[in-house]
């Protein structure tokens, strides 16, 4: 828990316990003789170790009963101004990564609210002068995904306005509806990327494996739920006109107290 106090022996004990084949996840990708490869893995690697039960279950964080506020400082050069140099972020925990619909739905909402042309959250914050650069982040590579709205080049005293603008904008979207073209564009964009499976310079097998871990690490019976995403994309297309996305905003962004306001200010 306190890295500077970690002794060398405790470090070795931790490594022996958790960096052991019994606590590993092994997958094979490609056209191969599976029996031959598994035999090789056993003979050259796994047979050198005894199977040892390792309790490495990742537990859910207890939900907050109210939003938490965190203030931290970061260093700037002596000649830099503290004005317009604060970072503000509004963060909410969004279910778990084992919910394949939420896993993708908030990818779509991140696009529609913060990245699409005329994205309402981004526009509202910029129009209010709360920061000079607004971005969104949706991290669904962890057990409890986090949706964030981030304002750069803001000021500490704008925190209340930052929260007010976000929540007022979201309430208006729930009441009057989200831009359906933006939702469809977001779904089409993410579905195209999924079908294309173009990972640039990264090996496809590696990237597929990393996607497996988004669910496999937390439920060993569900390694492939995010690899079988076409039915989920079809479901999301059907929900565009039903109020489904507005209900998600109400439940996970407005009514949800499991979140934080983080202020990173210069010193």
Task: Annotate the PLM regions.
Residues 1-63, 83-105, 111-267:
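Charge-rich, well-structured scaffold segments of protease-associated domains
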Residues 67-77, 194-198:
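Short, low-order "capping/linker" segments at domain edges
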């Amino acid at each position: 828990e306190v890295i500077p106090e970690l002794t060398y022996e405790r470090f070795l004990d931790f490594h022996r316990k958790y960096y052991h084949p019994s606590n590993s996840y092994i997958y094979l990708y490609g056209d191969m003789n599976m029996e031959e490869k598994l035999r090789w893995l056993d003979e050259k690697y796994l047979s050198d170790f005894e199977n040892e039960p390792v309790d490495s279950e990742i537990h859910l964080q207890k939900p907050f009963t109210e939003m938490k506020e965190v203030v931290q400082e970061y260093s700037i050069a002596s000649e830099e101004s503290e004005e317009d140099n604060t970072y503000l972020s509004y963060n909410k925990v969004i279910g778990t990564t084992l919910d394949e619909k939420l896993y993708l739905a908030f990818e779509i909402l991140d696009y529609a609210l913060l990245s699409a042309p005329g994205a309402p959250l981004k526009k509202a914050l910029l129009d209010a002068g709360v920061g000079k650069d607004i971005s969104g982040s949706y991290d669904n590579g962890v057990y409890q995904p986090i949706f964030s709205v981030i304002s750069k080049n803001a000021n500490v005293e704008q925190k209340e306005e930052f929260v007010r603008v976000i929540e007022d904008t979201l309430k208006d979207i729930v009441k009057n509806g989200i831009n359906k073209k933006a939702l469809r564009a977001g779904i089409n964009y993410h579905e195209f990327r999924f079908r294309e499976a173009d990972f640039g310079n990264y090996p496809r097998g590696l990237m597929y494996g990393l996607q497996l871990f988004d669910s496999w690490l937390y439920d060993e019976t569900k390694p492939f739920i995010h690899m079988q995403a076409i039915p989920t994309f079809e479901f999301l297309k059907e929900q565009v006109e039903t109020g489904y996305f507005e209900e998600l905003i109400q439940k996970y962004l407005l009514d949800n107290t499991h979140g934080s306001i983080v202020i990173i200010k210069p010193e």
